[in-house]
Amino acid sequence: MNKLLVMLAALSLTASCNCFKPEKRVHRLLTDRTQTLAVAESCTGGSIAARFTAMPGASAYFLCGVVSYSNESKAELLGVDPADIARYGAVSEQVARQMAEGVRRAAGADYGVATTGIAGPSGGSAEKPVGTVWIAVATPRETVAILKQCGTDRGQIIDRASAFAIGLLRDCLNGN
């Protein structure tokens, strides 16, 4: 019984230090490699930037965060092609990729992360329901994008999309 209590206490202490959050791993990888990051967020509204800048030492790698909520800001600030927004929609793989590449280029960063999605409660459709989120990471070698369904509650969607984006960046940094 005592051994079980010690194990539970150790687990509780470990969990409370947030050692398992993906942003901690990304923070360490970018800092150790002296590489930089910029983010472009639509549906996550700055949540990704907030998660990184909340950590001491983020200024070593975090260059900027752009909340490009409107289609116009995606085009003007990030260089997203308005024709692609019209053709595929703001919530699309093409737009997410261009956002990530655009923020990476504009900031001169090694990595660019972007999210675009439908956080709800309205705005969804049969093709793109509430909770649909495209996430992209632009690296020095390539740009990768994933589609995620992040639930139906606005707060949950923002939290999950942010976590998925940071996880995708971590995977790219790890070479996966």
Regions of interest found by a model, annotated:
Residues 13:
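RNase H-like, Mg2+-dependent phosphodiesterase core
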